[in-house]
Amino acid sequence: MASTCLHYGQQSFEGLKAFRGKDGKVRIFRPEENAARMQHTSRGILMPELPTERFLEALDMVLRLNKDFIPPYESGASLYIRPLMIGLGKQVGVSPASEYMFLMFVTPVGAYFKSGFRPSPMAIMRGYDRAAPLGTGQYKVGGNYVASLRSGVLAHEMGYSAVIYLDAKEKLYIDECGPANFFGIRGKSY
């Protein structure tokens, strides 16, 4: 119960998907990049860095043990993979943990956009920030996502599919569009 992941948010995570191709082969997009981002987060929140080789070994193992749960190509679904590192240890007080646990779990998931790829209305909500400047916004930690729960629910209640977050300092520039990429086009330039 007395662990830094529960009390102070010392945890990091990644998210990958395994897709079965038409040829039956399983594919994952750039897992080395996820390993590198997890290492960046670990440095930022004072957790040990998991070597890329260990990350990839764990990924291979979790896929091998769960190969029967990777949906068929025709389904459009995938196997979601969640690598996670948490700070443990018996301590209360804001400081790095004395122990850490790395784990990976998987779950089959359907297509992210249930109605396919099409334009979707999104809300700009100036009263909310997804991440604070000079804080943990550059790291993949849960605290950055819990901050978006209220604005996300409000956007859905107003009929929008998601929130476009503006920069926290000036509220002038697009900072993030959670579930998708954002492209702005004016005339013939973007």
Where are these regions (language model features)?
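Helix-start/capping segments and mature chain N-termini
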Residues: 1-62, 84, 91-190
